[in-house]
């Protein structure tokens, strides 16, 4: 079996990030971004998607977390794209609906090579989890979609607790991506009538 692993390093005047992923891992995570709540979300992503993930990142968080969170989306998008390779045998589509107590969220995606984000998640105005600005979650997923080439739809049906909403989003994302990148031996080549993705 081909090893579906990749790594990326990105250094700018604002951030310094390294990310490694194994799409066929067991959900092992080492995540150090200096943003505790974001570390928690990325660890959830690893565990519930069964991806092995190593993330190390630092940035100008004395200003705010925006640059680091967005650049982390760029890096995660790149490693997922690289790890998928030519997408031979891949299921391609993934969807998951996840409850978190009073919250219900669905993520549906297509590893089509066409980046597009639909994000229907509303946090209460000025919502934070600890010191983390929850509006940055959208910026993370936009950067991820743009750099992975994945069409990504994230829909919150309902929810009241902001922490629960964020967790449901990341868990559903993990499960949907895990489904989409899974291999089906019945698929010859890639799952497209065009012959490429």
Curated annotation (Swiss-Prot):
Instruction: Name the pathway.
Output: Amino-acid biosynthesis; L-histidine biosynthesis; L-histidine from 5-phospho-alpha-D-ribose 1-diphosphate: step 6/9
Q: Which Pfam families match?
A: IGPD
Name the Enzyme Commission number(s) assigned to this protein.
4.2.1.19
A GO BP entry: L-histidine biosynthetic process
Q: What is its main location?
A: cytoplasm
Q: Which domain of life is it from?
A: Bacteria
Keywords attached to this Swiss-Prot or TrEMBL record, sorted alphabetically, are:
Amino-acid biosynthesis, Cytoplasm, Histidine biosynthesis, Lyase
- The top EC class, named as a word, is lyase
Query: Where in the cell is the protein located?
Result: Cytoplasm
The family line of this record is:
Belongs to the imidazoleglycerol-phosphate dehydratase family.
UniProt xrefs under HAMAP family: HisB
Q: What is this protein called?
A: Imidazoleglycerol-phosphate dehydratase
Gene coding for it: hisB
């Amino acid at each position: 079996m081909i090893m579906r692993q990749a790594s990326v390093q990105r250094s700018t005047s604002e951030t310094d990030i390294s990310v490694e992923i194994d799409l066929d891992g067991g959900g092992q995570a080492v995540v150090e971004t200096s943003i505790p709540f974001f570390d928690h979300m990325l660890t959830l992503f690893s565990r519930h998607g069964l991806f092995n993930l190593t993330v190390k990142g630092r940035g100008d968080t004395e200003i705010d977390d925006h640059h680091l969170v967005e650049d982390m989306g760029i890096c995660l998008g790149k490693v997922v794209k690289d790890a998928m390779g030519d997408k031979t045998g891949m299921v391609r589509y993934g969807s998951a609906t996840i409850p978190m107590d009073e919250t219900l969220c669905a993520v549906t995606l297509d590893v089509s090579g066409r980046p597009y984000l639909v994000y229907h998640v509303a946090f209460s105005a000025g919502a934070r989890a600890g010191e983390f600005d929850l509006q940055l979650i959208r910026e993370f997923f936009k950067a991820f979609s743009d750099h992975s080439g994945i069409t990504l739809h994230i829909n919150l049906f309902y929810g009241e607790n902001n922490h629960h909403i964020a967790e449901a989003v990341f868990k559903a994302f993990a499960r949907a991506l895990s489904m989409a990148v899974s291999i089906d031996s019945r698929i010859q080549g890639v799952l497209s009538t065009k012959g490429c993705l």
